[in-house]
A protein has these predicted regions:
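Non-transmembrane "mature" sequence context
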Residues: 1-173
Length: 173
């Protein structure tokens, strides 16, 4: 369905379009795919505010994410074992929580990577559950490993991202 409007929309007064689970973050305004993905990432990490570009995301990683971002990821369907294997070991996370420390830059980067790729999978498959299911199922392309296993490394995450874009464009199954 194409929405038409006669006058520019003030994003601060934008109407929320509801229809699918992820639509709660879509505003009735002209938003690029990148902006939408940045909004999804922020939501998954439990962060408020608006990122204007990927450069803002880099700055966020450099400032280090709060530990509550891990809790937000768990609330969005990421499993504890996935947190421990992709982002931060269990004991390290326990220490960070006890000391009320932020995640390290590396952990923050991995958290953003996980949020970005789970958001992309949800977008491609049209549903959060379907996206997570795809990420957790072994794939021949990944030599029998799951996409979630591949996300643990930057190189693996690039392959997962490439595969998701190919699926989205109808070039892969």
């Amino acid at each position: 369905m194409q929405l038409k409007r006669k006058e520019p929309v003030d994003p601060l007064k934008a109407t929320v379009i509801v229809g699918k689970p992820w639509d709660e973050i879509f505003a009735y305004a002209e938003i690029s795919k990148g902006d939408v993905m940045l909004s999804w990432i922020m939501k998954k990490l439990g962060l408020r505010g608006t990122l204007k570009s990927e450069a803002d995301l880099v700055a966020l990683v450099e400032e280090r994410l709060p530990v509550v971002s891990i809790s937000a990821l768990l609330e969005h369907g990421i499993l504890e074992k996935e947190i421990y294997s992709v982002i931060v070991p269990r004991r390290t996370l326990q220490h960070r929580r006890a000391r009320e420390e932020k995640l390290s830059r590396e952990e923050s980067d991995r958290a953003v990577r996980l949020a970005r790729l789970t958001s992309l999978a949800e977008k491609v498959f049209g549903d959060p559950d379907a996206g997570r299911h795809w990420l957790r199922a072994p794939k021949k392309r990944f030599r029998g490993r799951t996409p979630m296993d591949m996300i643990a490394t930057e190189t693996g995450s690039r392959l997962v991202e490439e595969t998701l874009y190919q699926i989205d464009e109808g070039m892969a199954a």
